[in-house]
UniProtKB/Swiss-Prot annotation:
Protein name: Riboflavin synthase
GO biological process: riboflavin biosynthetic process
Gene source species: Methanothermobacter marburgensis (strain ATCC BAA-927 / DSM 2133 / JCM 14651 / NBRC 100331 / OCM 82 / Marburg)
InterPro entries, A to Z: LS/RS, LS/RS_sf, Ribfl_synth_arc
Cellular component GO terms held in the UniProt record: riboflavin synthase complex
Length: 153
């Protein structure tokens, strides 16, 4: 059985981890999901690394919702850098799934974006694990997670 890690935060205003888990369960079998929740996005890198090294996860999703302030953007960048370092240290993919609070003005639109992005990245995880040829087929197609695809040039 393949182990997959889901790591999310209490700072987020939407349960993206729950949406990702729901999506994985709908579209894949033979996966054991291990979920960890941390306070904020800067806690994600070590939590994801622990899921890989201590729990044996073959792939991890890191889900977070940085706030709208400049300091939140700095924290998001630091978290992203940490996630990249964790990937390189463990030779394991960590799918970064961030939705910035200022991506949408309306809270309902932000909720829809967070749900869609979490679910579409969960589908990416499934494809990376079980159908990598699908991703190759879609290379250069302008695919977007959470918002409409923009298409190829």
């Amino acid at each position: 059985m393949i182990k997959v890690g889901i790591c999310d935060t209490t700072f987020a205003r939407y349960d993206m981890g729950g949406a990702a888990i729901d999506e994985i369960k709908k579209h894949a079998t033979g996966i054991k999901i291990i979920r960890r929740t941390v306070p904020g996005i800067k806690d994600l890198p070590v939590a994801c690394k622990k899921l890989i090294e201590e729990e044996g996860c073959e792939m991890v999703m890191a889900l977070g919702m940085p706030g709208p302030e400049e300091k939140d953007k700095v924290c998001a960048h630091e978290a992203s850098t940490g996630l990249i370092q964790a990937q390189l240290m463990t030779n394991t993919h960590i799918l970064e799934v961030f939705v910035h609070e200022d991506e949408e003005d309306d809270p309902e639109d932000l909720k829809v974006l967070a749900d869609n992005r979490a679910r579409e990245h969960a589908q990416n995880l499934i494809m990376m694990l079980f159908r990598p040829e699908r991703l190759t087929r879609d290379a250069g197609m302008g695919m977007r997670e959470g918002k409409p695809d923009v298409g190829p040039l």
